Amino acid sequence: MVKLCAVCGMGLGSGLLVKMGIERVLEKHGYGRNDFRVEIADISTARSMTPDIFVTTSEFAKSLREVNAEVITVKNLFDENEIDAAIIDIFEKILNEKKK
């Protein structure tokens, strides 16, 4: 299972929308809920979390420099095409490594 974290300013409404977008993207590629889990966090909380992948904007990515995870930045967190292009290769690489 690949753990992802959608990071936004407050970790509330916009984070939930981003989480749902990530879930739709991964489901569109045929992945099920046993392949991934998406959490939501504000930037302060995110630094103490341990997902495999953070998805956020470049503004918040600067605060995640020292984490031990992939940090994927997107310009528009609500654009599912952009999310898809940004995360799918890294997601599949991590998932395949975990299945070995």
Task: Name these PLM-found stretches.
Residues 2-100:
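Short polar/charged helix/loop
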